[in-house]
Every structure is written in C-alpha cells, then in structure tokens.
C-alpha cells in the first residue's frame, strides 16, 4: 500500500472537517436552514423581550429608555473543532421593527456540539444607533464595541451606571449568561 503525501493527507483532513460540520448542522440546526419570515422574526423578538424583562430585574424601564434594540431571539452555535453561529433578528426603534438583520460569527478551538442563545443589543445614544444603521455589515470589535453586561443575583439593571453607547446581553434557556463576548460577530441587514 502506498503512503499518501503530506498535502494529500491535509486535503482529506480538511474535507473530513467540512463533512462533519455539514452533518452536525443537518442534525442540530435543521430549523435554521430555512430563513424565517418577517412575521416569524417579529413574534420571536416579542417573546425574547418578554423573557428578558422577566429574567433581568429593572430591564423594562431600561429598555424603554433605549434609542434602539437589536434582538436575535435564537442564535445557533455549532462546531466540531471549529464552528460558527447564525441567527436572525430585528432592529426596533420606539417599539416598532424598522429593519431585519442576521448575525454570523466563526469560532476556533476545542468545541463539539450545538447550543442556542438569545442576544439583545441596546443602543443607548443616537450616534451609536446612527453609525450602526449606516454601516454595510457591522462587525463587533471593528466597527464598534459592545459592552456585554453581567448582573449578579439580587441586583437590578440601572442605566445611570452604564457609560457605554452600546451594551449587550446574552441569555440561554436558564437566563443571563456570564463570561461571554460578542467579539467578531457581524450584523448584516436583510431584506424581508
């Protein structure tokens, strides 16, 4: 039997990873393969905001004072060694949806499996919101930063203590998640 050369082995290994990711996406992320309608996104955003207000003390007045909210009700992250995440959401201003967006990010490192999370991005000033809306694909860490907020048990969200123009919250089925970053996530406008 003839040994394969290094480039050939490397090429086969790459395709094994690609096939593995495709199978993983097919098993766990079948529901993300079909883009949601505008109505489906709006209903999911409503539910996500209701859950956010229930899970995070003081969030209702905080959200009411925001200049804009970018909500991704379900962002799926899947990977085998390297992976990615995808979700669809809506930008709301004054309680009304004005645009639809998707989010994508790639990740590398030790990982296997899939998980779902909700992302709520809050624009606290007009300039930050305007800069976001005028961009053609806005990437966290490149086009601007998002301060991911964590709140300890027994404390309430207080906007007077937040000095950042854009803040973000990441939640899973159990509530607010800790030690997460949105660095590298890209938000792009969709036509709906």
Segments predicted by a language model, with ranges:
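Small-residue-enriched, tightly packed secondary-structure blocks
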Residues: 34-192
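Compositionally biased non-globular segments, especially hydrophobic aliphatic-rich helices
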Residues: 10, 25-28, 33
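Bacterial N-terminal signal peptides
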Residues: 15-28
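N-terminal secretory signal peptides that target proteins for export/translocation
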Residues: 1-12
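Helix-centric, low-specificity signal for extended rod-like, repetitive segments
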Residues: 2-3, 21, 32
